[in-house]
């Protein structure tokens, strides 16, 4: 932060400082030797939020030499372009969608990822769809990683002996960041899904169902699987309560789309209706049981109740302070001054 404000890079560690180089390479080697045989390791990391410089570039060179089969990632080089080959991908934290578009319009030599984005603190993850939609239009944008998955909180008992999830300041420490680490899409403790999880799940689904009044366009974004491996269900809910349910056979090949006629007719009785087309697992998986919903789309419409004429009519009386309305079986007075019922 000091370097960003002052442009004085003497404060940056490790940067180009030779006294730090052996230590950084030792750290890289220790991590490499520990994890090199783990199949889950796809990318080597040179660290996090340490600006740029020669020392981190040498770490990257070490990984490339010892393991040319894997990629190397580092975000800080976006602040120091002298060693742009440090990372095999362009990596930035929390850029706007417009900033990503602008960058790739000038330089698309590398795939672009957000190593952190859509910070999930509090009532967040809004407008996340702008980033996931960008993957459909910008080939070099490869997505991002949400900070964070689980609230960084721990169990603590209140004065009544009841457990709760505690965070900064709950132990009397000052200064503190308070709830800054309560930034997950899953709650701490029992790992229940927060309301943010629903938004994330919807944006990450690999099947898009664009539902209209009488049809649904199914867009299969999966690379390898047909939609026929899932059960497709169609439900109609009236004022929030499901009143009809049926199935729909789909067979959309990977990376293609098909439009199907909805098997349920449009409702005629007054009310608000939600038509939902959803896809579910047919059988148990390691990560979810049969019936688990993997994707859905929805269309909402209203059937208005016919308007009834008032045979006796109504009388409106206006004054300086109030407006009165009188009918056959009612009287009501509105305040002009306060804008409400009197």
Where are these regions (language model features)?
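Extended substrate-binding grooves/exosites of carbohydrate-active enzymes
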Residues: 1-215, 221-228, 233-242
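A short, sequence-level motif marking secondary-structure junctions
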Residues: 94, 250-252, 335-341
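Hydrophobic residues positioned within well-ordered beta-strands of beta-sheet architectures
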Residues: 214-216, 232, 260-262, 275, ...
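Short, well-ordered beta-strand segments enriched in hydrophobic/aromatic residues
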Residues: 215-220, 325, 329
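Intrinsically disordered, low-complexity Pro/Gly/Ser/Thr-rich segments with frequent PxxP/GP/PP motifs
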Residues: 230-232, 237-270, 279
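Terminal connector regions
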Residues: 267-306
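Beta-strand-rich N-terminal accessory domains
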Residues: 276, 281, 304-342
């Amino acid at each position: 932060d000091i370097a960003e404000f002052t442009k004085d890079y003497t404060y940056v560690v490790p940067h180009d400082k030779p006294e730090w180089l052996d230590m950084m390479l030792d750290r890289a080697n220790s991590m490499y030797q520990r994890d090199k045989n783990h199949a889950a390791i796809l990318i080597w990391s040179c660290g996090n939020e340490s600006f740029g410089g020669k020392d981190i570039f040498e770490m990257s060179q070490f990984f490339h030499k010892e393991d040319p089969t894997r990629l190397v990632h580092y975000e800080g080089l976006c602040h120091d372009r002298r060693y742009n080959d440090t990372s095999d991908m362009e990596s930035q934290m929390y850029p706007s969608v417009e900033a990503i578009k602008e960058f790739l319009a000038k330089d698309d030599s590398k795939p672009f990822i957000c190593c952190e984005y859509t910070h999930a603190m509090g009532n967040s993850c809004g407008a996340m769809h702008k980033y996931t939609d960008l993957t459909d239009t910008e080939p070099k944008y490869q997505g991002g990683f949400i900070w964070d998955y689980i609230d960084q909180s721990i169990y603590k008992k209140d004065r009544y002996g009841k457990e709760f999830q505690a965070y900064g300041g709950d132990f009397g420490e000052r200064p503190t960041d308070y709830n800054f680490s309560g930034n997950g899409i899953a709650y701490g403790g029992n790992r229940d899904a927060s309301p943010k999880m629903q938004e994330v799940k919807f944006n990450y689904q690999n099947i898009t169902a664009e539902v209209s009044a009488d049809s649904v366009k199914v867009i299969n974004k999966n690379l390898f699987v047909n939609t026929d491996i899932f059960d497709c269900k169609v439900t109609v809910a009236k004022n929030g309560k499901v009143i009809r349910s049926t199935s729909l056979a789909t067979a959309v090949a990977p990376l293609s789309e098909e439009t199907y006629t909805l098997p349920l007719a449009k409702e005629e009785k007054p009310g608000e209706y939600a038509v939902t087309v959803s896809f579910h697992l047919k059988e148990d998986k390691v990560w979810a049981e049969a019936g688990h919903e993997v994707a859905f789309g929805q269309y909402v419409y209203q059937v208005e109740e016919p308007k009834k004429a008032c045979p006796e009519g109504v009388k409106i009386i206006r004054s300086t302070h109030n407006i009165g309305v009188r009918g056959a079986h009612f009287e009501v007075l509105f305040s002009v001054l306060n804008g409400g019922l009197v």
